[in-house]
Design a protein with these regions (language model features):
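Two-metal-ion RNase H-like nuclease active-site motif
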Residues: 52-65
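Mobile genetic element proteins and their domesticated derivatives, centered on retroelements
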Residues: 14, 30, 59, 75, ...
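Short conserved beta-strand segments at catalytic cores or DNA/RNA-binding microdomains
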Residues: 5-8, 66-82, 92, 100
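DNA-recognition alpha helix
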Residues: 10-23
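Active-site beta-loop-alpha junctions of metal-dependent nucleic acid enzymes
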Residues: 32, 36, 85-107
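C-terminal domain-tail junction helix/linker
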Residues: 158, 167-217
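Short, basic alpha-helical nucleic acid-contact segments in DNA-binding proteins
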Residues: 9, 24-25, 32-54
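RNase H-like two-metal-ion nuclease catalytic core shared by retroviral integrases
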Residues: 138-154, 166-168
Length: 217
């Protein structure tokens, strides 16, 4: 599951890598693991997440699903932490409003400043959800989030497209979670002298911590 969320690998490649290690499963099993365990790992990590910043860059990109495009609303804070992602079949005020409401609920932070492009959906959405936030629009201000989109688009490009919105949401959530875990936005995976993982990078140590937490639950 970690390989799938971290690297640009299809399910069939994960199956092959597991087979090399003596684990024989089919692609549907890997798919089921990703859908089932991704929310569990995210929930287990939640108490260890660094607090999200109050300066948000928000934008939408698109991913392929069942032969059509759907919109991925995303936000990062001033430190580069992925705040949230919300998938929608529409690109309108209702979708933007739902995104802001979800992002605030999940992060438990209300932004002081939000930068967006000039899409007409954002001002009414912000007035409805976080009217106290300062709103800035402009191309320069959006460069960071537009660059950040490439991580998600690169990951989804190696797939053959999603079939259901809910399944796509889990994978996009997991991708952002994995980015944050690797980049140190959780108090997990810090060096602890564990002889089993003396040279392991932060992500592997953090994943090991979470796996032990879930196993003990």
């Amino acid at each position: 599951m970690r390989w799938y969320l971290r690297f640009r690998l299809p399910y069939t490649d994960i199956v092959e890598l597991l087979a090399e290690r003596g684990v024989h499963v089919d692609a549907s099993s890997v798919y089921d693991w990703v859908q089932h365990f991704t929310p569990l790992y995210k929930d287990a990590a939640r108490p260890h997440r660094h607090r999200v910043g109050t300066r948000w860059a928000v934008d939408e990109t698109y991913i392929r699903m069942a032969g059509r495009w759907v919109y991925a609303y995303r936000a990062i804070d001033e430190h580069g932490q992925v705040i949230d992602v919300y998938l929608s079949a529409t690109r309108d005020t209702a979708a933007a409003t739902a995104f802001f409401a979800q992002a605030i609920a999940r992060s438990d932070v209300r932004p002081r400043l939000v930068t967006t492009d000039k899409a007409a959906a954002y001002p009414p959405a912000l007035r409805a959800v976080v009217p106290e936030a300062e709103h800035i629009t402009g191309k320069m201000e959006q460069q960071a989030i537009e660059r950040d989109h490439q991580h998600l688009k690169g990951r989804t490009r190696s797939m053959r497209g999603f079939q259901r919105l809910g399944c796509a949401q889990v994978v996009c959530d997991g991708h952002g979670f994995m980015r944050n875990l690797r980049d140190g936005f959780y108090r997990l995976g810090e060096p602890s002298g564990d002889p089993r993982l003396p040279q392991a990078p932060r992500l592997v140590r953090a994943w090991d911590d979470l796996t032990q937490t879930l196993a003990a639950a």
